[in-house]
Regions:
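Alpha-helical, largely C-terminal catalytic domains
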Residues: 1-349
């Protein structure tokens, strides 16, 4: 295994978390309880073979994947929100496999074996063989295929290939101990699954916006801003998890190691970016709503859903044990002193 960098801050770290000013309200899909129940069964029956042991499976069962799906896609059709939860669990698992420094996150050769197994499922070349990684990806794709138009499915598979390609770049960079500049880092991580997820949101609503995305630069820019929001929010809350794994592929680490910021300054910069990206999205959304394409009911509904995705991802990030540690139950504190340890995030208030 390649060496990872020594911890730059020690084994118990404190900082002040500013309250993040929010513009867009939070909304949750009314079928959350059902989605959670069915997603638990899905993880057990379809993904269990991907995990290294039972403890890892249990952790994924408690990470609130279905809640994330229901918060970022609250207006999905009832029969599709469950598939959105399945998507979340499946691809969050692949993200763990490829990003965890204790798994394959610093082992390019082994990671490439997984990627080579998955790619035929994304290229229309799957012959029904392959290992467990291909089967899980293939089955997840096939669940949505009957409800997607051919052009939407083609775009979705392209999104997933971009996701996989970004994994490859990240594993190699992590193994070399390289820390990219902020723009390179942001571009790489926006590519890592963000557009694939937004296509799933679009699918959840029952829309196919392929043509609109091809012709409207503004709509593409709005979706890009959602992807940027995902990255900056996730990096704030996932810093604990990644730092204690020895993974410096995180915005806070980029600001500290490449820009020379202290931890508190890096946290405040990231919180400022979270607010800035949301403001930019709201402005872009208003611009589109005032244009010809913004008169379309499907475009208007999708723009509304993209806003909920921004708000929902932030809300979920306070709550999930995925970032905050096993057994985490959020106490409602949004600002104040925070302590991070290898086991958990503690919100002191």
């Amino acid at each position: 295994m390649a060496e990872v960098r020594p911890k730059m801050l020690g084994d118990e770290v404190e900082f002040y978390l500013p309250e993040i000013k929010r513009i867009i309200p939070v909304k949750c899909h009314p079928q959350y309880a059902r989605a959670e129940e069915l997603n638990t069964r899905y993880i057990r029956s379809e993904l269990r073979g991907l995990y290294r042991d039972e403890a890892e499976c249990q952790r994924n069962l408690t990470d609130l994947h279905a809640l994330w799906a229901c918060l970022v896609n609250p207006n999905a059709k009832d029969e599709r929100i469950v598939k959105g939860a399945y998507w979340t669990s499946c691809w969050f698992t692949y993200d763990d496999i490829m990003s965890d420094a204790g798994w394959l996150g610093v082992m390019p050769a082994q990671a490439q074996e997984v990627i080579d197994d998955v790619l035929p499922a994304l290229n229309g070349e799957d012959d029904g063989t392959g290992k467990k990684y291909r089967k899980a990806a293939r089955d997840n794709i096939l669940m949505m295929q009957p409800d997607m138009t051919p052009r939407q499915m083609k775009r979705y598979l392209r999104n997933l290939r971009e996701y996989i390609d970004a994994f490859t770049d990240e594993v190699v960079m992590r193994a070399r101990g390289e820390i990219p500049d902020w723009k390179t880092y942001l571009d790489m991580h926006v590519t890592s699954g963000c557009e694939a997820n937004l296509t799933v949101l679009e699918y959840g609503q029952g829309f196919d916006l392929t043509e609109e995305l091809e012709t409207s630069k503004e709509l593409r820019e709005a979706r890009r801003l959602v992807g940027e929001s995902y990255v900056v929010v996730n990096d704030l809350f996932s810093f604990r998890k990644e730092y204690f794994q020895g993974d410096y592929g995180n915005a806070i680490s980029v600001f500290m190691l490449n820009e020379g910021l202290q931890l508190q300054d890096a946290v405040e910069k990231l919180c400022g970016l979270i607010e800035e990206v949301e403001r930019k999205f709201v402005e872009k959304r208003e611009e589109i709503l005032g244009s010809n394409i913004g008169t379309r009911p499907d475009v208007r509904a999708h723009l509304s859903e993209l806003g909920y995705a921004i708000a929902g991802n932030l809300e979920w990030s306070y709550r999930t044990p995925r970032y905050n540690g096993a057994g985490h139950v959020w106490n409602g504190v949004r600002s104040g002193k925070v302590t991070i340890t290898p086991e958990r995030t503690i919100y002191h208030g």
